[in-house]
From Swiss-Prot:
Protein name, UniProt field: Ribosomal RNA large subunit methyltransferase H
Family under the similarity heading: Belongs to the RNA methyltransferase RlmH family.
Functional note: Specifically methylates the pseudouridine at position 1915 (m3Psi1915) in 23S rRNA.
Keywords: Cytoplasm, Methyltransferase, rRNA processing, S-adenosyl-L-methionine, Transferase
Record's keyword annotation contains Metal-binding: no
Catalytic activity: pseudouridine(1915) in 23S rRNA + S-adenosyl-L-methionine = N(3)-methylpseudouridine(1915) in 23S rRNA + S-adenosyl-L-homocysteine + H(+)
GO molecular function (one): rRNA (pseudouridine-N3-)-methyltransferase activity
Enzyme class, UniProt record, top EC level: transferase
InterPro entries in the cross-refs: Alpha/beta_knot_MTases, RlmH-like, tRNA_m1G_MTases_N
One Pfam family recorded for the sequence: SPOUT_MTase
Residues reported to bind S-adenosyl-L-methionine: 73, 104, 123-128
Assembly: Homodimer.
Length: 156
C-alpha cells in the first residue's frame, strides 16, 4: 500500500524536509510514504485567491492516481485519536487501495478537493503552519503503523 501525501508548497525549510524524510524512511516497503509537492500560487496584495485555490486544487486532484482513497486534512474533519488513526489505517489497508492525503495551502483546500474526498481528518483544532503539518502527519501515520504491527515505537 502506498500513502501519498499531496501538499501545497515546494520550498520547505531543511528541518521540515529532514523531519518528513525521517518518518518516510521508517516505513516498510509494503507501506510506502510518498510526498507530492504542488507549487503554491503566487499571492500578493491583489491576488485572486479564489482562482489560486482553484488552480492548486486542480493540480492536487491531477496528482492523485485513479482509484486512490482520498482523505483531506481540514478543520471540519474527524478528530482521530492515535488508536482511531491506527484503525483507519488498518481499514485502508484492508480496502486494498492506495491513499492520498491532501494538505492545502494558506487558505486551505479547494472545494473540488473536499468534494472528491471520501474522508476528512482534522489534525488539530489549532492553526498549524502547513510545513509542520507534513512532519506531524508523517509521524502520526508511522505511529499508527507501529500500533498495527506491534512495533515498540508507540507506548501507552
Amino acid at each position: 500500500m502506498k500513502l501519498q501525501l499531496i501538499a501545497v508548497g515546494t520550498k520547505m525549510p531543511d528541518w521540515v524536509t529532514r523531519g518528513f524524510e525521517e518518518y518516510q524512511r521508517r516505513f516498510p516497503r509494503d507501506m510506502a510514504l510518498e510526498l507530492v509537492e504542488i507549487p503554491a500560487g503566487k499571492r500578493g496584495k491583489n491576488a485572486d485567491i479564489a482562482r489560486i485555490l482553484q488552480k492548486e486544487g486542480e493540480q492536487m486532484l491531477a496528482a492523485i492516481p485513479k482509484g486512490n482513497h482520498i482523505v483531506t486534512l481540514d478543520l471540519p474533519g474527524k478528530n482521530w485519536t492515535t488508536p482511531e488513526l491506527a484503525s483507519a489505517l488498518s481499514k485502508w489497508q484492508l480496502d486494498g487501495r492506495d491513499v492520498s492525503l491532501l494538505i492545502g495551502g494558506p487558505e486551505g483546500l479547494a472545494p473540488a478537493c473536499k468534494q472528491a474526498a471520501a474522508q476528512s481528518w482534522c489534525l488539530s483544532a489549532l492553526t498549524l503552519p502547513h510545513p509542520l503539518v507534513r512532519v506531524v502527519v508523517a509521524e502520526s501515520l508511522y505511529r499508527a503503523w507501529s500500533i498495527n504491527n506491534n512495533h515498540p515505537y508507540h507506548r501507552e
